[in-house]
Amino acid sequence: MDGIKYAVFTEKSIRLLGNNQYTSNVESGSTRTEIKHWVELFFGVKVIAMNSHRLPGKGRRMGHTMHYRRMIITLQPGYSIPPLIEKRT
């Protein structure tokens, strides 16, 4: 799992879950085809489309943080990605 870092939960990403679209941050060097292949292989789903944009790194007092890419992955109807962490009761 070199490509995908973690899932993103913002107001927009939660709204997009209703359209069967999932948002996650990925490594900046990974390509769309690598991410698509990994998602289809690991989760067993079919990907229709992928949108991506690069987010800038943040400046620090000394140095900076690396930039990263955010992918919005659209799945075919009938497929979904299950939550990776179960809620504790």
Swiss-Prot record:
Protein keywords: Chloroplast, Plastid, Ribonucleoprotein, Ribosomal protein, RNA-binding, rRNA-binding
Subunit details: Part of the 50S ribosomal subunit.
Superkingdom assignment: Eukaryota
GN (gene name): rpl23-A
Pfam families named in the record: Ribosomal_L23 (PF00276)
Protein's name according to its UniProt entry: Large ribosomal subunit protein uL23cz/uL23cy
GO biological-process terms attached to the record: translation
Subcellular location: Plastid, Chloroplast
